[in-house]
Every structure is written in C-alpha cells, then in structure tokens.
Regions:
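Canonical P-loop GTPase G-domain recognition
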Residues: 137-194
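Conserved C-terminal guanine-recognition region of P-loop GTPase G domains, centered on the G4
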Residues: 103-153
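Short glycine-/polar-rich loops that comprise or flank the Walker A/P-loop
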Residues: 8, 95-98, 125-129, 153-156
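Conserved catalytic network of the ASCE P-loop NTPase/AAA+ motor domain
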Residues: 52-53, 61-69, 90-95, 121-126
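Switch I (G2) and immediately adjacent beta-strands of P-loop GTPase domains
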Residues: 40-84
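Inter-motif core of Ras-like GTPase G domains
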Residues: 84-107, 122-124
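Conserved G1/Walker A P-loop phosphate-binding module
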Residues: 1-49, 61-63
Length: 194
C-alpha cells in the first residue's frame, strides 16, 4: 500500500502594470483569492480602476497524480506591477519554484520595462520561467515578444487571454510541465531516474 504524498510548489506571478497577473490568479485559483488592491491613482487610473499594492494569492490543486495517491499544490503569489511597489517582488521571490512572467501583447509601450523587470527577477534565480503573453492568440507573436524581452529559446511561452479561465488553465499546464522538467533534470543530475 502506498502512502499519499503532498507536493507543494511556490509560483511567482510577475510582470509589468496591467499585464494580467491578478486576472491569471483569479481565473485559476481554487480558493478565494487574497488581494491587496486599492484604487489606482494618477495617469495609471485611466488604464485600470484598481491595482495590487502588496500581493495577490491563490491556489491550484491537482489530485490523483501517480496512480491517484499524490496531490500537487501550486501556491501562486502575484506581485504588484508598479515600480514603487517593486520591492515586494524581491520579498515574494524567496524560495520560488517557477516564475510566470505575464506581459500584455497590446501594451508594447511596456515592453522595455518588462525586459528590465524580467532580467531583475531572474538574475539570481535558477528556476524555470514561463512567459504568458496576455491578449495574444498567436504563438509566433508570443514567441517574438518573449524573445524581445530576453527570454531564452528554451523558455516556455504561451499566448493567452487571461479573462478566460480556460486560457489561465493552459498557463497553469505550462507551469506544471516546467516543474516536471526541472524535477526530472534535478533527479537525473543526482543519479535519479534515467
């Protein structure tokens, strides 16, 4: 008789202002989403009414893994996108297992900032990266945007429409694949499966 195993992974959901980070977490979370949204002020108020100032938090569970005995828990931590709250990203990225970087394909004016953010987030992390290109239906366009942000060719890139929960689940599927691949690589390098 096998015993039930619990696998919990921390996912950092980050990216520029109004990219769709909160939308992703709200679309896929199986628990009530904890948000720290307040009314947006200044020029940004014309883009969206509310903005995250500390973090968003949601969970996703996948039961029945490995002959029904294991459960995978994803703990999703969303960062603020505004520069003045950027320090929260450094706090939230501690002990992260995967970074999901969300960028809005319809906001090319944010790409330079997104490139800088991505470099800052990943510079000291050795974890998988998934780039979710929101408001995009084309794999080619999504790949071109991710390349422009400095993502390596090996990075998973997914076009998505994060107002649609099904699209959010596709992003989660990419996160799970990235976790599986990184776990397999780690086990192989430690003499695990071959």
């Amino acid at each position: 008789m096998s015993s039930m195993t619990d696998h919990t992974f921390k996912i950092l959901v980050t990216g520029p202002f109004a990219a769709g980070k909160t939308s992703l977490i709200q679309a896929v979370s199986q628990s009530p989403v904890v948000t720290t949204e307040v009314a947006t002020t200044g020029d940004e108020a014309s883009v969206k009414a509310n903005t995250t100032v500390a973090m968003d938090f949601g969970t996703f569970e996948l039961d029945g893994v490995d002959d029904g005995e294991d459960t995978i828990h994803l703990l999703m931590f969303g960062t603020p996108g505004q520069d003045r709250f950027r320090f929260m990203t450094d706090i939230l990225k501690a002990d992260v297992d995967v970074v999901t970087f969300v960028v809005n394909a319809e906001a090319p004016e944010s790409f330079a900032e997104a490139r800088e953010m991505l470099a800052l987030v990943m510079h000291d992390l050795k974890v998988p990266l998934v780039v979710a290109v929101n408001r995009c239906d084309s794999h080619e366009q999504a790949r071109a945007i991710a390349d422009g942000l400095g993502a390596l060719p090996s990075v998973a890139v997914i076009p998505c429409q994060l107002v649609d929960p099904a699209s959010g689940r596709e992003v989660v599927a990419e996160v799970l694949v990235a976790l599986l691949q990184s776990t397999e690589l780690a086990l192989t390098s430690q003499g695990g499966f071959r």
